UniProtKB/Swiss-Prot annotation:
Belongs to the universal ribosomal protein uL1 family. Binds directly to 23S rRNA. The L1 stalk is quite mobile in the ribosome, and is involved in E site tRNA release. Pfam families: Ribosomal_L1. One of its GO terms (biological process) is regulation of translation. It comes from Rhodopseudomonas palustris (strain HaA2). GO terms for cellular component: cytosolic large ribosomal subunit. Coiled coil: none annotated. This is Large ribosomal subunit protein uL1. GO terms for molecular function: rRNA binding; structural constituent of ribosome; tRNA binding. Part of the 50S ribosomal subunit. Keywords: Repressor, Ribonucleoprotein, Ribosomal protein, RNA-binding, rRNA-binding, Translation regulation, tRNA-binding. The keyword Ribosomal protein applies.
């Protein structure tokens, strides 16, 4: 079946003008995730912020109670004992100058990036490579840290970084279609709570304005914003 026809069929039964309670929306999305692979369940939160203003930037990290369901490759910039700690904690790639050279050459064999503070002068050179991918280590979200073992375990265990995009939207994967409805609802509420706690001082009016849930290949379902808390 062509993707267009499949999506059209999946949209049947969804009222595009209606806002559904979160649990009902998740059920509808799961029922329509019928691809041969285990689709990712994604959430989009439209926020009442303008991220072009520094005092309206939203970013942070949340530990999803039920994990993400995906295998996350973690790269760590560290030396000596901290490099050993990172390896012992399960980091996939660990290095210093050698890892910087690999990344500069375009060999990025990780999805998340962690660094010890002393490595940042080196890692700072990679801003043009890691920045656009949203992978630049940042102390505000715990990826520049001396606790590399804790950061690696968190990244592997279900921590999700979020950052508002230009249009004022936070998007994140919150699990897989194979997850139970209850686990997906718990993960979505954890994300919404973390985004709420990250509300910037410059935000005025309604903060979480619109919410939608979808699967990788399926249609979006609009959610009552009040039901995500």
């Amino acid at each position: 079946m062509a993707i267009g026809k499949r999506l059209k069929k999946a949209r049947e039964g969804i009222d595009r003008t209606k806002l559904y309670p979160l649990d009902e929306a998740v059920k509808m999305v799961k029922e329509r995730a019928v691809s041969k692979f285990d689709e990712t369940i994604e959430v989009a939160l439209n926020l009442g912020v303008d991220p072009r203003h520094a005092d309206q930037m939203v970013r942070g990290v949340v530990m999803l109670p039920n994990g993400t369901g995906r295998t996350v490759r973690v790269g760590v910039f560290a030396r000596g004992a901290k490099a050993d700690e990172a390896k012992a904690a399960g980091a996939d790639v660990v290095g210093a100058e050698d890892l910087v050279e690999q990344v500069q050459a375009g060999n990025i064999n990780f999805d998340r990036c962690i660094a010890t503070p002393d490595m940042m002068p080196l890692v700072g050179r990679l801003g043009k490579v890691l920045g656009p991918r949203g992978m630049m280590p940042n102390p505000k979200i715990g990826t520049v840290t001396m606790d590399v073992a804790g950061a690696v375990k968190g990244a592997k265990g279900g921590s999700v970084e979020f950052r508002v995009e230009k249009a004022g939207i936070v998007q994140a994967g919150v699990g897989k279609a194979s997850f139970s409805e209850e686990k997906l609802v718990e993960n979505i509420k954890a994300l919404a709570d973390a985004v709420t706690k990250a509300k910037p001082t410059g935000a005025k009016g309604t903060y979480i304005q619109r919410v939608a849930v979808s699967s990788s290949m399926g249609p979006g379902v609009k959610v009552e914003p009040g039901s995500v808390h």
